[in-house]
Design a protein with these regions (language model features):
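Terminal leader/tail segments of proteins
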Residues: 1-95
Length: 95
């Protein structure tokens, strides 16, 4: 198991959401007890589910803070079954 540190979302410091920063550079968003988004060390963003309205707000805050993009981008890549590179904008099907 990788070691990681945990921080709050800047825009939602008291929310039931945590950002996990792994030693290898991977970043994950945990909303309540569920991992809902991952950015791997190469910049590939994957959204694992949209879940509740509150979790969607967490995803939106995560997107703005870590990608500079909005929730609608996360929703689109999730519903289309893609992952997106946050550095290049490249989009590929989920493996």
């Amino acid at each position: 198991m990788f070691n990681y540190t945990t921080t709050n979302l800047s825009a939602m410091p008291y929310a039931q959401a945590k950002v996990l920063h792994f030693e290898d550079g991977t970043i994950q968003l945990r909303s309540y007890a569920t991992i809902v988004a991952t950015i791997d060390r190469e910049g590939w963003l994957s959204i694992h589910g949209l879940y509740s309205m509150t979790t969607r707000k967490h995803i939106g805050a995560f997107m703005r803070e870590f990608t500079g993009m909005e929730y609608q981008t996360a929703k689109q890549i999730y519903t289309d079954g893609y992952q997106m590179n946050i550095h290049t904008g490249e989009v590929i099907p989920l493996c």
